[in-house]
Amino acid sequence: MVKILLKLLLALLMLGLLQGCGSLFYWPEEGLRGTPDQLGIEYQPVNLKTSNNLNLHAWWFPSRAEEPAKPQGLIYYLHGNAENISTHFMGMTWITNHGWEVFILDYRGYGLSEGKPSIAGVHHDAYMGLKWAIAKAKEQQLPLVVLGQSIGGATAVTLVANARAEEQQQISGLVVDSAFSGYRRIAREKLNESWLTWAFQYPLSWTITDRYSPEKHIKNLPANLPLLFLHSCTDSVIPCSHSQRIYQQAAEPKTYLEAVEGRHIEMLSQLKWRRELVVWLEGL
């Protein structure tokens, strides 16, 4: 019976992996649980279109700071792999009180965005969002910072590293919060956690593309781009060794902040680390 279950599990895993790994890395939630205006937060919906005509849904949040009158800059926020912007936006809109605008995109299949997520598709969506953010920041003559959390952080590294030279010049900083260093590496670690799948960790992980992994692109980031890495060493979802790995490979100027407690992507929910981020942004 155990052998039959193992064979069935292996077949299901192989099927999921060979179909683009979307079900393994992406857990979208369709629709929205609510909108910012229900909480009294000003925002504007933004609609983008992919090269294959998918409609993507996003939100832009203006600065809420009274002084200075002009915003400090624009943060392009790439969220994690689960749910959608209606559950993620509060994780970054606090910074609008410090004078920053925030732009947050839902990848294909998330929220009101059309399509089905895949590694390649999500990276394409992130690039569509980057082009919008660059145009918005340029229009207002504001610095642009790209900030990604979890899989959004992994996406952000590869996104910025592969943007065109003129686009890279418009980016003033990159923040990577609790990201993994490689798709294949994190898949192997997760397969290793269960006795049902540990024996298949290597053969199955090799079916996953590493083309978009941060560790393969970190050295291609623009020269002198300020980098900030954050990770909790008690993160049970993505070990902090992943952030340490890409941090070590990155060029200066770079900063690494590590918490000694807290769960996955919880650092920026704490006042201490929010202050650290604001100080870092002020130094750009």
For the regions a protein language model found, what residue spans apply to each?
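Alpha/beta-hydrolase fold nucleophile elbow
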Residues: 139-150
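C-terminal catalytic histidine-bearing segment of alpha/beta-hydrolase fold enzymes
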Residues: 241-284
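Membrane-embedded segments
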Residues: 51-133, 142, 154
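Short beta-strand/loop motif that positions the catalytic acidic residue
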Residues: 221-223, 228-235
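Hydrolase active-site cap/lid region
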Residues: 158-217, 266, 271
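An N-terminal hydrophobic leader/cap segment in hydrolases
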Residues: 16-49, 56-59, 63
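Glycine-rich nucleophile elbow surrounding the catalytic serine of serine-hydrolase chemistry
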Residues: 148-158
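Short beta-strand immediately N-terminal to the catalytic nucleophile in serine-hydrolase-like folds
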Residues: 146-148, 177, 230
